């Protein structure tokens, strides 16, 4: 029984070690900054270019993240294989996140359409009468981000994910409600900086193995 508990604790520590490189922090910080830049509402109104640029920014952040994992983390830690319980948690997390991502996408599209198409804007005003429509959309967007990121942090044992979830929720609210990208940009930088510090420390603590060690 003790050995079983010890193995679970070792696996948990090994799973958490995948976050010690700080790359997830950098990735989420970049996502927040791209949101702040490309969701800023211009005076002349939104265009589909805003959406295209935002999606391109997300893809760039993901490519940088995967590339850094492959070129920096994998050569130093190797490929880690986890047990069935941990794999089941990852599958559950993927399903839950898939649902929340779909909700986020729907909210994002609905919000953009409301700004682009007057008829849909009127529909939003009917659903949220008065001057509270923007406040309601902003709160819903922030709540979806906060809940989805918190669920992700729980199932992945990513402890820093809890405060990142809170910061990203605040950033989304400020983006939608105040339309001042400087505040979410600052929040994105606040998320990225600890990630860079962790990445530098990770590289120093885990130098690349020499060619002799690889042959052994």
For every predicted segment, state its role:
Residues 205-216:
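Short, highly charged, low-complexity non-transmembrane loops/tails of multi-pass membrane proteins
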Residues 160-173, 186:
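Central hydrophobic cores of alpha-helical transmembrane segments
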Residues 56-66, 142-151, 171-173, 189-201:
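Alpha-helical transmembrane segments and their membrane-interface exit regions
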Residues 52-56, 126-141, 188-189:
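Structural signature of hydrophobic alpha-helical transmembrane segments
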Residues 150-164:
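Membrane-helix interface "capping/anchor" motifs
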Residues 1-27:
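N-terminal juxtamembrane cytosolic/stromal segments of multi-pass membrane proteins
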Residues 178-193:
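Loop-to-transmembrane alpha-helix initiation sites
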Residues 28-119:
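Selected alpha-helical membrane-embedding segments in polytopic membrane proteins
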């Amino acid at each position: 029984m003790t050995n079983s508990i010890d193995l679970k604790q070792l696996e948990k520590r090994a799973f958490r070690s995948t976050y010690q490189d700080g790359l997830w922090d950098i990735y989420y910080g970049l996502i927040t900054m791209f949101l702040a830049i490309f969701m800023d509402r211009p005076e002349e109104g939104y265009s589909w270019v805003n959406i295209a640029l935002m999606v391109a920014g997300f893809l760039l952040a993901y490519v940088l993240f995967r590339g850094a994992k492959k070129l920096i983390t994998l050569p130093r830690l190797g490929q880690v294989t986890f047990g069935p319980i941990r794999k089941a948690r990852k599958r559950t997390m993927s399903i839950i996140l898939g649902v929340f991502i779909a909700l986020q996408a729907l909210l994002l599209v609905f919000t953009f359409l409301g700004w682009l198409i007057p008829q849909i804007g009127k529909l939003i005003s009917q659903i949220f009468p008065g001057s509270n429509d923007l406040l309601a959309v902003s709160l819903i967007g922030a709540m979806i981000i906060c809940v989805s990121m918190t669920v992700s942090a729980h199932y992945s044992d990513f402890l820093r994910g809890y405060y990142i979830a809170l910061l990203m929720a605040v950033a989304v609210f400020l983006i939608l409600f105040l339309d001042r990208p400087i505040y979410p940009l600052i929040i994105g930088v606040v998320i990225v900086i600890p990630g860079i510090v962790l990445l530098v420390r990770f590289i120093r603590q885990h130098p690349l193995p020499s060619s002799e060690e690889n042959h052994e």
